[in-house]
Structures are given as C-alpha cells and as structure tokens.
Amino acid sequence: MTTTLTLIRPDDWHLHVRDGAALAAVVPHTARQFARAIIMPNLRPPVTTAAQAVAYRERIAAAVPAGVDFTPLMTLYLTDNTPADEIVRAQAAGVVALKLYPAGATTNSDAGVTDVRKTYAALEAMQRAGMPLLVHGEVTDPAVDVFDREAVFIDQVMRPLRRDFPELKVVFEHITTQEAADYVAEADAHTAATITAHHLLYNRNAIFTGGLRPHYYCLPVLKREVHRLALVKAATSGSSKFFLGTDSAPHPAHLKEHAAACAGCYTALSAIELYAQAFDDAGALDKLEGFASLHGPDFYGLPRNSGTLTLRREPWQLPETLAFGDAQLKPLCGGETLDWRLLA
C-alpha cells in the first residue's frame, strides 16, 4: 500500500476567492497547495475589463503569505456587450481566459450572457488571440429540469459553439454528467474539462443523507451515482482532456444554512487531499499527477511547475469551522476524517 505520494506541484484551474476580508481568509489555503489558480470573475460588480482584472490580481497577491510562491491567473467575465478590443487589452495585461456564465445560472451570474450569439465578436477575437473560453455549461430555461441542464447545454450551446469557432480553446467547467464526460472525450484537442473533488466523491444522495445538508449544495448540482462513476472514469483515464478545477466557492455559514441556501462547496482547505482520496478509492493514484499537475498547463500552453508537494497516508480531522471575515466558513467534510494529508 502506498503511504506517501509526491507530485509535481499542482494548479487549480477553477477557483473562487471572493474579495476583501473573505479573500484574505481563503487565499492562503489555496496558495499552500497550488502554484497557480484560475480566478473566477463573478464578483459584484463582475470583473469585465482588463483594468479591473489587474486590480483584482493585486488584491489577491497581497493576501498570499510571505515566502509562498503563488500566481493568480486572471479571467474576465464575458457579457453580451464585451467588445473585441477588450480581448486585446486583456491579453496585453496578462489575463489568460474569459468566463461564460449563462445569465442566472449560478452565483453572481445575473450579468451573464443571455444569448451566445451576442458574444460572437468577442469570441472571434479570442480565437485569433488563442485565449481560452471557460464555460459554465448549464441552460437556464426554467422548463428544463435542474438535473438535465448540463446535458441540454451540450446540444443547445456547446455543439453550435464548437461548429462556429473550431479553433477556439474551450474548457467545459466542473462537468457533472456522463454526457459531458463523453462529449469532451470525443471532442477535438481544442476542448477540455475541469472536474471538482466533490463531484468525484459524492452523488446527489449526499445532499439529503440524514436531513438536508446545504454544504453539499453546489451548481451544477451533484448528480446520480452513474454520473459520478463516469467522472471518476474520465479523471482517472489518463486523458489530457481532463484536469483539476476545484470550483471551491466560499460562502458565510449563515448564508449556506439558510432558507435559500447559497450554492457552492468550500474545498480549498483540503483540496489536494480530497482529490487523493478520490483517486485512491478508484485505485488510480498513479493518474493523479497528470490530472492535477500536467494536463492543465499543457492545455493552456503554460509551463509545468518545477516544485513538488508530498502527501502522506495519515488520518486527520478537518476543522468544522474557519474564520471568514466577520463570519464563519464551514469547509466541505468539516469535522470528518480524511485519509491523506499534505505535508508542510
């Protein structure tokens, strides 16, 4: 039995860090494990310009503990009105991607895209620049069942998008279904996907076991076991199309434990340990380094990291709560025991 595991230092290709005091509370958790992270732009107001992204990057950098090497990779929030020349400014400022949120699909997405065709000028500029598009892949039509919105998105949005922009790099973010895993596996080399730790570890029963458990509520929502197994198969396949993206999404505990609970699981505290658990459960620890450390930078055209981190098979208990500005934050699996621990 493997007792220690050393990996090239991984990156997180999908992360929420919020802003202000909340940002200061969570950035150190990610920086301890990951060399880089793609930062989501869904603040209030959203990060829609290169200048806003640069300012946000500076605020994140200021929260990184002294002596820790961590680089935030910035994104812009795509809207119906994003001009093509903003893509040029963004690339010049070091912004690495744009994020497409269908309007109303998730947290702070009300300023998102109402019709993908309205973004075609920006997408053409991105295709020319080689800048990836990161997609929250759910339709928002209220007539479509919440558990079917990802599968419907593939036919209604992804296929036409890929047809019209065949050279555009597209990341299908936080996939949750067998349909999405199959779609990405069968697509060309310009299409990839991120997968979260919680979608690898849990199916939708986790939300309801022993009562309603809001800290397991996220968007896209957890799905049936058949879909979880398909995600595990994809993540552990060794395919370079699939890579790590936590979608760690912190919310104050009182807004999670609420009549209208916020969507999002906070996994950044123990992200790499959770992924190690999922890969260990699948008997595929040998595939974790590719998924966590290699496939993402290769797709983005960035250098692989040179440092390493080491995990040890050592049971440890996650804290139940964390400080989060003036509030508390409850990590996923808080108070529970994990089998793998990151060595300091």
Curated annotation (Swiss-Prot):
Alphabetic keyword roster: Hydrolase, Metal-binding, Pyrimidine biosynthesis, Zinc
Chain sites annotated for binding Zn(2+) 2: K99, H136, H174
Residues forming the catalytic site: D247
GO CC entries: cytosol
N6-carboxylysine: residues carrying this PTM: K99
Enzyme class: hydrolase
Annotated positions binding Zn(2+) 1: H14, H16, K99, D247
An example Gene Ontology biological process: 'de novo' UMP biosynthetic process
Entry EC number(s): 3.5.2.3
Cofactor note: Binds 2 Zn(2+) ions per subunit.
Amino-acid positions noted as binding substrate in the UniProt annotation, renumbered to this chain: H16, V17, R18, N42, H136, L219, H251, A263
UniProt cross-references to PANTHER family, sorted A to Z: DIHYDROOROTASE
Subunit-structure text: Homodimer.
Reported function: Catalyzes the reversible cyclization of carbamoyl aspartate to dihydroorotate.
Record-given protein name: Dihydroorotase
Encoding gene, per UniProt annotation: pyrC
